[in-house]
């Protein structure tokens, strides 16, 4: 991508579609033990139940909100200035970091001094980068292992609970039937958490700051939060917490601009992206990343080898440890929260891919495989892994240990190359934990349904319960254009089995670079998969939103049905295609069945008839059938009648 004349930093504006509040929703904040712990949630208001159905109050539902200040009407949004440094005071108070005089990476200094990039550079506040003081470790894992509950951990505990207790109390206080209503709306099917006996899959009824600390200390969860990304709202990735999703964005050599990528980021978090990976491979990667980080309230991940490759003009064999090291420092000083590093692609595994249908499909994996073969040497990522850990813990960058040998077709699933790399990732995890560096493990890929659980079981065993982060997996290879669905099936399954974060797949997978519409489609599909996994695991409170929507559906509260859904806009659009009038929003039927065949309307009629007759619903059904039988005989006992 050349300097795009359509993007000038002086003209940059936030995407208007990303800042509009969702229908019947407002941003609320829950305050923690200190005033600056203000945890955002989305409050969805509901209409009262119609008097014909009992006329009760329906209190607001609270849902997890990843949109940051963008959907807060009281926030002043200026992407040229960036977001407020929410965590800055917490970082300062710990007293274990130092502010550097300037950038220390060679490339970072070059870009800052290059007049050719001046019109593209982020113009807002340029903070001096921070780094751990000599001899200090500033990772959330280190604090957790010292028994310290950080403000980030308290923030996360409040966020994960989603005000569920307050919601149930408001139901109890709603009227004479409040206790019964709370019991009904809080009801949840028992889940099945796989591996609970052998591994710690056991979320408590209420998430506490101490529970967060303990899970991070054990390595079962990570809090990606670089000290140079103070704008981020703390979140957690771990299988005893809500399943999270990641959205990939990024330019390429042939398409997109900085402005488009910032728009994709704000669009992705509006619809529920918990983290965003900037996978840019075109020019101006450094400047694009700075704009994204300074405006992102969610953790940002990257694959540093992509930018390192650009620095050697795309020739993998010219890569060196020194170039890669400088790239790590450059990105850590900008504020990247987690790095995908393909240190498990070892020379000995490359020949194992020779008999594959689709070979090595990971870009990072193929880069390192080519380097290993060109030099006939062990990967410099593997050889220098301890040094990488030293860099990571100086900034609190988390590892996302890359699956460079993941299968690119179901034909190649669970083969020797994939599983050999997974074992190595387990060994590297132990090394990282020795440095108190946070780790998650990346997983496949393309895997048929019957082989998915094996992936999860082996990962838990070999990687000692480090969080699993998977791309799908795609369960079939026959649906280009629909791979958000082929992968959504696998994502729901592996999330149920224990995966902590799901990397979204858009309809453009294997076909092209996703646009904003594709990003939304991928996000919604994966929010659905993650939620289905939470339900299947029996995660506390996971069913509250389902119950609220089902109640709204039964009571024909159409607007509430739309607003409680993952995509209110699409739900309303589909309803309006056949019933566009406002009167249809209060009708006791929809266009699918019409007024005479609506099953829920028939059920309501039965209940009304039962109340009028003073009998139970079962007796009412029996009595109603007797009346209809008499009518049938009187009409001549004919099944069909000519009109």
From Swiss-Prot:
GO biological process terms held by the UniProt record? thiamine biosynthetic process; thiamine diphosphate biosynthetic process
Residues given in the record as Zn(2+) binding sites = 446, 510
GO cellular component terms given for this protein = cytosol
Q: Which reaction does it catalyse?
A: 5-amino-1-(5-phospho-beta-D-ribosyl)imidazole + S-adenosyl-L-methionine = 4-amino-2-methyl-5-(phosphooxymethyl)pyrimidine + CO + 5'-deoxyadenosine + formate + L-methionine + 3 H(+)
Residues that, per the record, bind [4Fe-4S] cluster: 590, 593, 598
List GO molecular-function terms, semicolon-separated: 4 iron, 4 sulfur cluster binding; carbon-carbon lyase activity; zinc ion binding
Which pathway does it take part in?
A: Cofactor biosynthesis; thiamine diphosphate biosynthesis
Q: Which UniProt keywords apply?
A: 4Fe-4S, Iron, Iron-sulfur, Lyase, Metal-binding, S-adenosyl-L-methionine, Thiamine biosynthesis, Zinc
Q: Which cofactor does it need?
A: [4Fe-4S] cluster
One Pfam family this sequence matches: ThiC-associated
Where, by residue number, does substrate bind?
248, 277, 306, 342, 362-364, 403-406, 442, 469
E.C. number(s) listed in UniProt: 4.1.99.17
Keyword check for Metal-binding: yes
Textual note on the cofactor: Binds 1 [4Fe-4S] cluster per subunit. The cluster is coordinated with 3 cysteines and an exchangeable S-adenosyl-L-methionine.
Q: What's this chain's function?
A: Catalyzes the synthesis of the hydroxymethylpyrimidine phosphate (HMP-P) moiety of thiamine from aminoimidazole ribotide (AIR) in a radical S-adenosyl-L-methionine (SAM)-dependent reaction.
Similarity remark: Belongs to the ThiC family.
Outline the subunit composition.
Homodimer.
Q: What is this protein identified as?
A: Phosphomethylpyrimidine synthase
Tell me what organism the protein belongs to: Burkholderia pseudomallei (strain K96243)
Please spell out the taxonomic lineage of the organism that makes this protein.
Bacteria, Pseudomonadati, Pseudomonadota, Betaproteobacteria, Burkholderiales
Task: Name the gene behind this protein.
Answer: thiC
């Amino acid at each position: 991508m050349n300097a795009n004349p359509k993007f000038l930093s002086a003209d940059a504006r936030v995407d208007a579609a990303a800042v509009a509040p969702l229908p019947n929703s407002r941003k609320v904040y829950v305050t923690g033990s200190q005033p600056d712990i203000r945890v955002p949630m989305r409050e969805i208001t509901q209409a009262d139940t119609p008097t014909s159905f009992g006329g009760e109050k329906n209190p607001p539902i609270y849902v997890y909100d990843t949109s940051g200040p963008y959907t807060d009407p009281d926030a002043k949004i200026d992407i040229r200035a960036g977001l407020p440094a929410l965590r800055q005071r917490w970082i300062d108070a710990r007293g274990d970091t130092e502010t550097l005089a300037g950038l220390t990476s060679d490339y970072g200094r070059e870009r800052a001094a290059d007049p050719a990039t001046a019109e593209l550079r982020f113009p807002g506040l340029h903070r001096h980068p921070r780094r751990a003081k000599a001899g200090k470790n500033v990772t959330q894992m280190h604090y957790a292992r010292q028994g310290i509950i950080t403000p980030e951990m308290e923030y996360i505990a409040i966020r994960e609970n989603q005000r569920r207790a307050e919601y149930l109390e408001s139901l109890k206080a709603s009227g004479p039937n409040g206790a019964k209503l709370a019991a009904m709306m809080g009801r949840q099917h028992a889940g099945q958490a796989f591996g609970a006996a052998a591994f710690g899959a056991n979320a408590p009824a209420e998430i506490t700051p101490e529970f967060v600390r303990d899970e991070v200390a054990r390595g079962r969860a990570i809090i990606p939060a670089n000290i140079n990304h103070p704008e981020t709202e703390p979140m957690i990735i771990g299988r005893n917490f809500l399943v999270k999703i990641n959205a990939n964005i990024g330019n390429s050599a042939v398409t997109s601009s900085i402005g488009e990528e910032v728009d994709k980021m704000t669009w992705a978090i509006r619809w529920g992206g918990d983290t965003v990976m900037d996978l840019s491979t075109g020019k101006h990667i450094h400047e694009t990343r700075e704009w994204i980080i300074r405006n992102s309230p969610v953790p940002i991940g990257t694959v540093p080898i992509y930018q390192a490759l650009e620095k050697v003009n795309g020739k993998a064999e010219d890569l060196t440890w020194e170039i890669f090291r400088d790239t790590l420092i450059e990105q850590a000083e900008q504020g990247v929260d987690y790095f995908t590093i393909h240190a498990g692609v070892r020379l000995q595994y490359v020949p194992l891919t020779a008999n594959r249908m689709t070979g090595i499909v990971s870009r990072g994996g193929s880069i390192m495989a080519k380097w290993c073969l060109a030099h006939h040497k062990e990967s410099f990522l593997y050889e220098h892994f301890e040094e990488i850990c030293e860099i990571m813990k100086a900034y609190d960058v988390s590892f996302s240990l890359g699956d460079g040998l993941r299968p690119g077709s179901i034909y190649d699933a669970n083969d020797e190359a994939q599983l050999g790399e997974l074992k190595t990732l387990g060994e590297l995890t132990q090394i990282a934990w020795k440095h108190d560096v946070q780790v998650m493990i990346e997983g496949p890929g393309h895997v048929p349904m019957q082989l998915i659980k094996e992936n999860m079981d082996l990962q838990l065993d070999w990687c000692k319960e480090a969080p699993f982060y998977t791309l799908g997996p795609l369960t079939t290879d026959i649906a280009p254009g629909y791979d958000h669905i082929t992968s959504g099936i696998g994502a729901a399954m592996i999330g149920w089995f224990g995966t902590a974060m799901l990397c979204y797949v858009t309809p453009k997978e294997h076909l092209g670079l996703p646009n904003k519409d594709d990003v939304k489609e991928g996000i919604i599909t994966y929010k659905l998969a993650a939620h289905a996994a939470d339900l299947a695991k029996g995660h506390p409170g996971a069913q509250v939103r389902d119950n609220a929507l089902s109640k709204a559906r039964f009571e024909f509260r159409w607007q509430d049905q739309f607003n409680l859904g993952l995509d209110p806009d699409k739900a309303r659009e589909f309803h309006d295609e056949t019933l566009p009038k406002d009167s249809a929003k209060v009708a006791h039927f929809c266009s699918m069945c019409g007024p005479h065949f609506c099953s829920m309307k028939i059920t309501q009629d039965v209940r009304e008839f039962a109340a009028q007759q003073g009998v139970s619903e079962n007796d009412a059904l029996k009595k109603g059938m007797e009346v209809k039988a008499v009518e049938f005989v009187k009409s001549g006992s004919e099944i069909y009648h000519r009109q």
